[in-house]
Swiss-Prot record:
It is an enzyme of class 2 (transferase). Its EC number is 2.3.1.274. The keyword Lipid biosynthesis applies. GO terms for cellular component: cytoplasm. Gene3D superfamilies: Isopropylmalate Dehydrogenase (3.40.718.10). Belongs to the PlsX family. It is found in: Cytoplasm. Catalyzes the reversible formation of acyl-phosphate (acyl-PO(4)) from acyl-[acyl-carrier-protein] (acyl-ACP). This enzyme utilizes acyl-ACP as fatty acyl donor, but not acyl-CoA. It comes from the Bacteria. Pathway: Lipid metabolism; phospholipid metabolism. HAMAP family: PlsX (MF_00019). This is Phosphate acyltransferase. GO terms for biological process: fatty acid biosynthetic process; phospholipid biosynthetic process.
C-alpha cells in the first residue's frame, strides 16, 4: 500500500501531547503504511516518544514550534498573529503537499479560518462545511452538516452541502446513492423558510443527489436517511443538544444501576451489554468532524478528546485521504454543473 502522511497539531486541545502523541503511536501501529508529522513543542512531545518502538519512531517526524493557538483566541486574531503556531504549520503542510491531511483538537473558529485561507475552497464551492456523524437506531452513521462553520446559508450553499455530504458518505462508508434530506420544521412541502424551500427545489431537479425530502428533528436518529443538511446555526445547536442528551442518558443509566442490591447484582450480570450500549451513546465514539469543501483534508477533534477519541479522528483523516475526498467532491460538482448547463 502507498505510504500516507498526516500532520497532527500536537499541541491542540485540552490535553495536548498527553493525548495526541500516544494516539499517533496507536495509529501507526494500526496502519503500517502511515507516517505522521507531529507539530508542536519538541520537548513536550519527546516525553511521550522516549519509550516508543523504534519502527514507529522511524515513521514520525517532529516539527518544533512553541507557538500555540489558545482556545480564547478569536479567529481573525489567530489568523493574523499565530503564523508560527502548531495549528497553522499543520495546515501549511497539507497546502504544500507534504501531508495528505491534518488533524487538530484546537480552537474550532481559528482552525476553520486558517484552513479556508490557506487551502482555499474547491471550484464550485462557496463555503466549506463542518460535518460529523451521529448514531442511529439502525446502528449506521448519519452525517449532519453544517455544524457551525456557516451560521446562515442561502439555498445554493445548502445545495452544495447536500452534494458534499453525499460524496462524503459514499467515500467513507462506501454507500451507493446515500439518502439526503433537508432538516426542517415539518415534512410537508409548504413548510420551511425561503432558503430551505429553494434548496429543496434545486435538489429535486438534481439526479446525482438522492434527495428524499424534508426531515424533522425527531427523525434525525431514525436511520431513515444518510445525510442531513441544515445551516450552521441549526446544526451546531442540534449537535450540542445531542451530546448533552447522550451524557444525561449515560448518567441516569449509571445512577439507576447503582441503586439497590438486586439492581447492582443484575448490573454485574449484564455489564458487557451495558458497556456496549454506553459506548454507542458516547459522543467520543463518533469523534472527528470534517471541514469539507476545501482543496485539502482537515479533521477537527473534540477539544477534550481522550486518546481513543483522538485516534478516531486520525482514522477518519486516513480514510478521507485514502479515498481522495476533495477530488471526489470536485468531480461530482463539475459533473452536476455540466448536467445543469446542458
Amino acid at each position: 500500500m502507498t505510504s500516507l502522511t498526516l500532520a497532527l497539531d500536537a499541541m491542540g486541545g485540552d490535553h495536548g501531547p498527553h493525548v495526541t502523541v500516544p494516539a499517533a503511536l496507536r495509529a501507526l501501529k494500526s496502519h503500517s503504511s502511515l507516517k505522521i508529522i507531529l507539530v508542536g513543542d519538541k520537548t513536550e512531545i519527546d516525553v511521550y516518544l522516549h519509550q516508543a518502538e523504534q519502527e514507529l519512531l522511524s515513521r514520525i517526524q517532529v516539527i518544533h514550534t512553541d507557538e500555540v493557538v489558545s482556545m480564547s483566541d478569536r479567529p481573525v486574531h489567530a489568523l493574523r498573529t499565530r503564523k508560527n503556531s502548531s495549528m497553522r504549520l499543520s495546515i501549511e503542510l497539507v497546502r504544500d503537499g507534504r501531508a495528505a491531511a491534518c488533524v487538530s483538537a484546537g480552537n474550532t473558529g481559528a482552525l476553520m479560518a486558517m484552513a479556508k485561507v490557506l487551502l482555499k475552497t474547491l471550484p464550485g464551492v462557496d463555503r466549506p462545511a463542518l460535518v460529523s456523524c451521529l448514531p442511529s437506531v439502525t446502528q449506521k452513521p448519519v452525517y449532519l452538516l453544517d455544524l457551525g462553520a456557516n451560521i446562515s446559508c442561502d439555498s445554493e450553499t445548502l445545495f452544495q452541502f447536500a452534494v458534499m455530504g453525499s460524496v462524503l458518505c459514499e467515500a467513507v462508508d462506501k454507500k451507493s446513492r446515500p439518502k439526503v434530506a433537508l432538516l426542517n420544521v415539518g415534512t410537508e412541502e409548504i413548510k420551511g423558510n425561503d432558503q430551505v424551500q429553494q434548496a429543496a427545489q434545486i435538489l429535486q431537479n438534481t439526479e446525482q443527489v438522492n434527495y428524499t425530502g424534508f426531515i424533522e428533528g425527531d427523525e434525525i436518529y431514525s436511520g431513515n436517511v444518510d445525510v442531513i443538511v441544515c445551516d450552521g446555526f441549526v446544526g451546531n445547536i442540534t449537535l450540542k443538544t445531542s451530546e448533552g442528551i447522550a451524557k444525561l442518558l449515560v448518567h441516569q443509566l449509571k445512577r439507576g444501576l447503582t441503586q439497590g442490591f438486586f439492581v447492582r447484582f443484575l448490573a454485574k450480570l449484564i455489564a458487557p451489554r451495558i458497556q456496549a450500549v454506553l459506548s454507542q451513546m458516547n459522543p467520543d465514539h463518533y469523534n472527528g468532524a470534517s471541514l469539507i469543501g476545501l482543496r485539502g483534508i482537515v479533521v477537527k477533534s473534540h477539544g477534550n478528546a481522550d486518546e481513543a477519541a483522538y485516534l478516531q479522528a486520525i482514522s477518519l483523516a486516513v480514510t478521507e485521504a485514502q479515498r481522495r475526498l476533495p477530488e471526489m467532491i470536485k468531480d461530482r460538482l463539475e459533473s452536476i454543473l455540466l448536467d445543469i448547463n446542458n
